[in-house]
């Protein structure tokens, strides 16, 4: 989860796609986006056994209705306090892991912004 959907798209295009292209093993697992039924888009990378879904903390739609065992929240200090009147995006993302109980993993990282107020 990036701070915005636009940042998620940029991260996908500038980091994730080149990573897949440069790794023979990943290239073999992730079907190219140009393949019609690949399941590979800018914000979703499907591979055997799972998928990588990217979204923004500014999108309530992107933070609901999808169980996730692993959630990586990046630059959380840039997240809005409330998203679309549905609450804290950090809490919304964490709710996606409820299905997995003690097997869930949340990775929360950020560049600190304001001393004493950073998440």
Stretches with model-predicted labels:
Residues 1-119:
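Phosphate/NTP-binding elements of NTP-utilizing enzymes
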């Amino acid at each position: 989860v990036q701070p915005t959907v636009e940042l998620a798209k940029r991260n996908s295009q500038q980091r994730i796609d080149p990573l897949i292209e440069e790794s023979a093993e990943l290239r073999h697992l992730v079907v190219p986006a140009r393949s019609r039924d690949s399941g590979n888009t800018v914000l979703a990378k499907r591979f055997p056994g799972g998928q990588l879904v990217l979204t923004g903390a500014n999108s309530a739609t992107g933070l609901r209705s999808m169980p996730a065992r692993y959630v990586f929240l990046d630059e959380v200090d840039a997240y809005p306090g409330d998203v679309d009147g549905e609450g804290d995006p950090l809490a919304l993302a964490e709710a996606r892991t409820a299905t997995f109980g003690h097997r869930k993993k949340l990775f929360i990282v950020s560049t600190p912004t304001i001393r004493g107020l950073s998440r």
